Each structure stands twice: as structure tokens, then as C-alpha cells.
């Protein structure tokens, strides 16, 4: 991307920053890229800091009509620009992990089309193929 086009796209991103549907739909896959472009350009960085500070002040002053996703994006952009977390009071962090517990033993065929699995040695259909499924809970921080 050329410098001026890249800057114009990033300026459009910053102008629409508080508009959650536009932000998340149009820029979603490219958010981290735009954060880096903003952090590396002095003019864009000053503009982004002003936008983030206004948004954070509005949030702390009780304007909770701002979408949480937008606040989270502002916090993420702040971190990329400043290299440190912004301590935003009254905001609950939105994790990027989906944690869901299910009991696979209770899974039954409800008449939906499903894949039939066969035993590898007898080639007979397996009645409950999930019975041999092993699920293991792993703490991510153990691997970091």
C-alpha cells in the first residue's frame, strides 16, 4: 500500500472509530495492522490518543452507551501506541477466548444428518463414537 493511501484509509478508520458496526465489520480483520500504522505515524498517533482519551473520559463519566467492543479496541490501540495498558475504571475486559463446557456423554442423535464412524478393524458402525473422545483442560499460561 502506498503511504498516502494507507494514511487515508487509517484516517477513515479513526474517524469512524466510535461507530462499532462500521469498525468491526469493515476493519475487523485489519485492526492490529491499523494500530501499528497509527503508532508509527506521529500525526495519526496524536489524533488517535485524543480520540482514545475522549472515549475513556466519556466511559468513566458514565456514558456506557459506547459499545464495549469499541472501548476494547481503543484499549488495544492504546497498548500498541503507548506500550502499556490504560487503567480504565469500570470496564470489564472482553477476553478473546470463548469458554464453554459441554457434556459429550449426553450427546444423542436427534434425527440430524451426521457422520457415521466405523471401527477400524471390524468395519462395523460405532454406536456412540464420542465415547472414546478425550477432552483435557489445559492452562495456556503453562505454555507461554
From Swiss-Prot:
Disulfide bonds: none annotated. Pfam families: Swm2. The keyword Repeat does not apply. It is found in: Nucleus, Nucleolus. One of its GO terms (biological process) is 7-methylguanosine cap hypermethylation. Signal peptide: none annotated. GO terms for cellular component: nucleolus. Keywords: Nucleus. Its main location: nucleus. InterPro entries: Swm2. Belongs to the SWM2 family. This is Nucleolar protein SWM2.
Amino acid at each position: 500500500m502506498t503511504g498516502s493511501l494507507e494514511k487515508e484509509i487509517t484516517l477513515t478508520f479513526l474517524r469512524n472509530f466510535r461507530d462499532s458496526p462500521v469498525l468491526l465489520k469493515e476493519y475487523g480483520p485489519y485492526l492490529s495492522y491499523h494500530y501499528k500504522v497509527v503508532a508509527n505515524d506521529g500525526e495519526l498517533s496524536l489524533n488517535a490518543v485524543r480520540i482514545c482519551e475522549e472515549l475513556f473520559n466519556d466511559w468513566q463519566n458514565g456514558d456506557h452507551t459506547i459499545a464495549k467492543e469499541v472501548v476494547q479496541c481503543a484499549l488495544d490501540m492504546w497498548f500498541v501506541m503507548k506500550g502499556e495498558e490504560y487503567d480504565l475504571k469500570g470496564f470489564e475486559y472482553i477476553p478473546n477466548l470463548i469458554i464453554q463446557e459441554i457434556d459429550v456423554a449426553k450427546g444423542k442423535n436427534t434425527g440430524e444428518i451426521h457422520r457415521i464412524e466405523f471401527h477400524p478393524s471390524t468395519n462395523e458402525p460405532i454406536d456412540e463414537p464420542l465415547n472414546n473422545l478425550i477432552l483435557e483442560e489445559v492452562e495456556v499460561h503453562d505454555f507461554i
